């Protein structure tokens, strides 16, 4: 039996993603899983990002983890330029408080929601003047 599945669904629809029958054939939804939202929430407005992350968390078994990373620019002018240049999709420069809110109801691991490069074993940044990635790991409370 294959242990992988490709899911063709809208990321913004957690029920469609996690309810996909091909996925359920390889992942038991009653057991802890890890959902990784790497470098995607900055394409969702803050309200939608909260709804989407909460949707995934609501469908995850206790002990599951949500891993999330989000690009963040301190320089608002640079962020605006990036948003204007990025024409394939709308890009949002979420505030650190927005990003922390995506973990509401979860137990934060490690250093919490912080710059990804500050996590253990992260390679040193070549140039961090323009922006960075905020990241965190949250665990669904329970067993």
Label the predicted regions.
Residues 1-143:
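Alpha-helical subdomain
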